[in-house]
């Protein structure tokens, strides 16, 4: 409630994304887009391949393989995002399909990051180069990575994450089961687990 409609919100999927640059750099890059909401993009049209032709037509830059909206990383002004997500999405609905359909209406100021200027979705050739996330297919240095996809995507995600941050592991010697879906680990308080 303390956020204004003019504030910028950055959304990243929780378990298969990580940042490779600062929030300041991401915010700076956001100001360079002509549209008010920016979504990551990917190679494959999922979950409904029948939308592929329509989705491709919406992109000015057709030169990259990343032509399809991916809802795993996006940013925009809060007021614009409120309008985009004004219609409720049921728990069993696909949020990516919802956003793709909203994008196709043309009613929202939305753009796909087809060059990976800010966001890169799973790309086997992406590497850490001179301390930054680099996509040789687009010659862009990006700010965030999303390892969306199957086992090979998760392997690439882990490899890139390790290149940027090294293996991070906090050894846990004991834990307490608080409920079916909550564990209390010795370096966390009970309040942190609720």
Describe each region flagged by the PLM.
Residues 1-5, 29-31, 194:
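Glycine/proline-rich, flexible active-site/cofactor-binding loop segments
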Residues 2, 64-65:
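Short hydrophobic/aromatic segments of transmembrane alpha-helices and their interfaces
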Residues 9:
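Short aromatic/hydrophobic "clamp" motif used to bind/position activated sugar donors
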Residues 66-183, 188:
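Catalytic core and acceptor-binding pocket of nucleotide-sugar-dependent glycosyltransferases
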Residues 14-16:
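Short acidic donor-binding/metal-coordinating loop in glycosyltransferase active sites
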Residues 18-61:
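Conserved donor-nucleotide/metal-binding helix-loop-beta segment in metal-dependent transferases, i.e.
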Residues 4-6, 33-36, 140-142:
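Short, high-confidence coil segments that cap the C-terminus of an alpha-helix
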């Amino acid at each position: 409630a303390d956020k204004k409609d003019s504030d910028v919100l950055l959304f990243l999927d929780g378990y298969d994304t990580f940042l490779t640059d600062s929030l300041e750099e991401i915010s700076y890059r956001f100001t360079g887009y002509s549209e008010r909401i920016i979504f990551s993009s990917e190679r494959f049209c999922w979950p409904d391949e029948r939308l592929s032709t329509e989705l491709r037509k919406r992109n000015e830059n057709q030169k990259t393989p990343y032509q399809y909206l991916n809802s795993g990383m996006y940013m925009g002004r809060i007021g614009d995002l409120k309008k985009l997500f004004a219609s409720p999405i049921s728990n069993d609905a696909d949020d990516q399909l919802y956003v793709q359909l909203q994008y196709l209406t043309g009613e929202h100021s939305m753009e796909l990051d087809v060059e990976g200027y800010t966001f890169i979705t799973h790309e086997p050739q992406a590497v850490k180069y001179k301390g930054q996330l680099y996509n040789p297919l687009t010659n862009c240095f990006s700010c965030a990575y999303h390892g969306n996809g199957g086992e090979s995507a998760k392997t690439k995600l882990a490899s890139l994450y390790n290149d940027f941050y090294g293996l991070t592991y906090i050894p846990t010697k004991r834990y307490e089961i608080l409920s079916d879906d909550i564990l209390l680990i010795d370096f966390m308080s009970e309040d942190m687990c609720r």
